């Protein structure tokens, strides 16, 4: 039986050329799989037909936007996930979602190899292959760009020689990856870390310096899940999409950072994630109101490790699954409403309310009606500081 390869297919030049390139290099039949995680662009059926026209023996497309939002973005919101305290894991979250469909297709079509279009220099090669090995331990992985030296110039020449039905126009100077949770821009003039980003690179966000009216929004959560915006019920996908539009119009969610890549180098990355930043900001503030102090403190440590695991491509690891359980439990009481003002590049929380709130007005107030018994404070301080006091006496001897 002829060997079969499942290819992660985008519909673009590189993966279209990869269909024939893989067939020539390996003699295998190629099955193209395109997964829609909200990246926009062409209709899925157009992409499917192009894959077949480029030589794929079969082509599958999957509308995974809701799945991506519910199963991948939502856990990140509950985890307040920001790698290096800034990056909301835009690309890292989409890779395991795509991998799940690739492995399922490989099993369905009895393929022994899964291929992707990553280079040998980035994080994504690890994310794809670590995920594939976790879900399909017997599957082999190949990357034509990395393994067969499929450069851009060679891809264009191959495309023209084979008369493939895809344009070979000049490539953008930037490397761009996008989905419903955000957009990543790198390379080109951004590789000089002194160069400021220009407005032309942004699509999800407007210039925050442009004058416009502020936008007030109320986001409602139930056990950490965004369930309504301004009182109107939403799915997780709808919440992200609506806040992408509203927060993006205010220039919220732009991130420019030098990032520690998994492969050991530092890389300059520019991100746009208006919906993600608005939702994480609101969720984190509601946690401040509803989550007990020691649980909240420990959750911050868990959040950091969770984000590192996802960034590093270990979505399917035992530790990540265990941390998921902790985060889910920590979100049980995260129910209520957060009011925010979206304006000039910032999402500012202006109001909080929750039936599960741990904020006690009578204990917190300094006005008449204060129920906090201040007479107990001195004894508490004496006990709390006792070990430090004993150590200080010793050190003075």
Curated annotation (Swiss-Prot):
PROSITE patterns, per the entry: ARGININOSUCCIN_SYN_1, ARGININOSUCCIN_SYN_2
Keyword tags: Amino-acid biosynthesis, Arginine biosynthesis, ATP-binding, Cytoplasm, Ligase, Nucleotide-binding
Pathway involvement of the protein, from the record: Amino-acid biosynthesis; L-arginine biosynthesis; L-arginine from L-ornithine and carbamoyl phosphate: step 2/3
Reaction catalysis annotation: L-citrulline + L-aspartate + ATP = 2-(N(omega)-L-arginino)succinate + AMP + diphosphate + H(+)
CC terms in the record's Gene Ontology section: cytoplasm
Protein's GO biological process: argininosuccinate metabolic process; L-arginine biosynthetic process; urea cycle
Localisation: Cytoplasm
Positions that bind L-aspartate: 119, 123-124
The enzyme's E.C. designation: 6.3.4.5
Main localisation: cytoplasm
Gene Ontology molecular-function annotations: argininosuccinate synthase activity; ATP binding
Binding positions for ATP per the UniProt entry: 8-16, 117
Residues binding L-citrulline, per UniProt: 87, 123, 127, 175, 259, 271
Family as reported in the entry's similarity comment: Belongs to the argininosuccinate synthase family. Type 1 subfamily.
Assembly notes: Homotetramer.
Protein name: Argininosuccinate synthase
Organism (species): Streptomyces clavuligerus
Gene: argG
């Amino acid at each position: 039986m002829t060997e079969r390869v499942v290819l992660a297919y985008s519909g673009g030049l590189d993966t279209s050329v990869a269909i024939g390139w893989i067939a020539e290099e390996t003699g295998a039949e190629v099955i193209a799989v395109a997964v829609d995680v909200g990246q926009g662009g062409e209709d899925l059926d157009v992409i499917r037909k192009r894959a077949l026209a480029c030589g794929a023996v079969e082509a599958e497309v999957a509308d995974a936007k809701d799945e991506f939002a519910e199963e991948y973005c939502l856990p990140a919101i509950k985890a307040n996930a920001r790698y290096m305290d800034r990056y909301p894991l835009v690309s890292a979250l989409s890779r395991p979602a795509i991998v799940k469909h690739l492995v399922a297709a490989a099993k369905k079509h009895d393929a022994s190899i899964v291929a992707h279009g990553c280079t040998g220099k980035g994080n994504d090669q690890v994310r794809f292959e670590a995920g594939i090995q976790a879900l399909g331990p017997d599957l082999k992985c190949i990357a034509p760009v990395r393994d067969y030296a499929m450069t851009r110039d060679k891809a264009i020449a191959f495309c023209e020689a084979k008369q493939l039905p895809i344009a070979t126009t000049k490539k953008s100077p930037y490397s761009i990856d996008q989905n419903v949770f955000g957009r990543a821009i790198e390379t080109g003039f951004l590789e000089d870390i002194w160069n400021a980003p220009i407005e032309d690179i942004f699509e999800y966000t407007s210039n925050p310096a442009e004058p416009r009216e502020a936008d007030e929004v109320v986001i409602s959560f139930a056990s950490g899940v965004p369930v309504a915006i301004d009182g109107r019920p939403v799915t997780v996908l709808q919440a992200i999409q609506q806040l992408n539009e509203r927060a993006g119009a205010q220039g919220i969610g732009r991130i420019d950072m030098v990032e520690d890549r998994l492969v050991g180098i530092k890389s300059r990355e520019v991100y746009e994630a208006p919906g993600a930043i608005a939702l994480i900001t609101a969720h984190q503030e509601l946690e401040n109101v509803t989550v007990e102090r020691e649980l909240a403190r420990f959750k911050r440590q868990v959040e950091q490790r969770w984000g590192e695991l996802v960034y590093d491509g270990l979505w399917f690891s035992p530790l990540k699954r265990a941390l998921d359980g902790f985060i889910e439990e920590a979100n049980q009481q995260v129910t209520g409403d957060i009011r925010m003002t979206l304006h000039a590049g910032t999402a500012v929380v202006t109001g909080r309310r929750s039936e599960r709130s741990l904020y006690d007005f009578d204990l917190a107030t300094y006005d008449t009606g204060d129920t906090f018994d201040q007479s107990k404070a001195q004894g508490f301080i004496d006990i709390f500081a006792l070990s430090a006091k004993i150590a200080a006496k010793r050190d003075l001897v």
